[in-house]
Amino acid sequence: MTKRWRADRRKDHYYKKAKAENYRSRATYKLKQIDYRFDLIQPGDIIVDLGASPGGWSQVAVELGGPESKVFSLDIDRMPPMEGVTFIRGDIKDDVTVRRLLDMIPEGANVVISDMSPDISGNYSYDHAKSIELCEYALAFAKKILRDGGNFCVKMFYGDMSKGFVKMVERSFEEAHVHHPKASRPASSEVYVVGLEFFSERD
């Protein structure tokens, strides 16, 4: 991270807003805006947050789900404890981690959210492909754990493989949308793919 990047971040509206409102990251506002648009999370929902650290999306999940909700947060890195959140350190690409989550939530989840991002190499084609790979892991997990009617949201770096991934989402959800929330930086290639009302795949 360069000095210029740090200086630009300090000037960023959502970065300053997150600091002032005691949120762990500016990404908090992306999920707030996505939920406002698509009504992803309902009170009492069981929510799984993939790539959760440092916890900004988990904070929003707890807020929107309320005291009756359950939030399970997964990341390969550590995350400071958070009231109302069960944290699991692991990799969604690891079958043992996936099985552990499924065993922890035998009743299934209402919502799966993912703000996972690959390590950026600077080669956009490579980074896009790695982003799609993470999206596919998130979707595969969502299809294992979501209840009928459940919702899904995943970050994706937009590129030539994006339409194919959106079609995969369309096969398992009544609605699929691609959304660029206002809190995403204007120059960013990131978008969020939202799947609403999960169903088992049909022929």
Residue ranges and their predicted role:
Residues M1-P43:
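Class I SAM-dependent methyltransferase Rossmann-like catalytic core
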Residues Y36-Q42, I105-P106, K144-I145:
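Glycine-rich helix-loop-beta junction characteristic of Rossmann-like nucleotide cofactor-binding loops
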Residues P43-S53:
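Conserved class I S-adenosyl-L-methionine
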Residues P54-P67:
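Conserved SAM-binding loop of SAM-dependent methyltransferases across substrates and taxa
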Residues P67-E68, I145-N151:
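Short glycine-dipeptide loop
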Residues L74-S121:
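S-adenosyl-L-methionine
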Residues I132-D148:
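A short glycine-rich, Lys/Arg-flanked "PGG" loop and its adjoining helix->strand segment in the class I
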Residues G159-D203:
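Class I S-adenosyl-L-methionine
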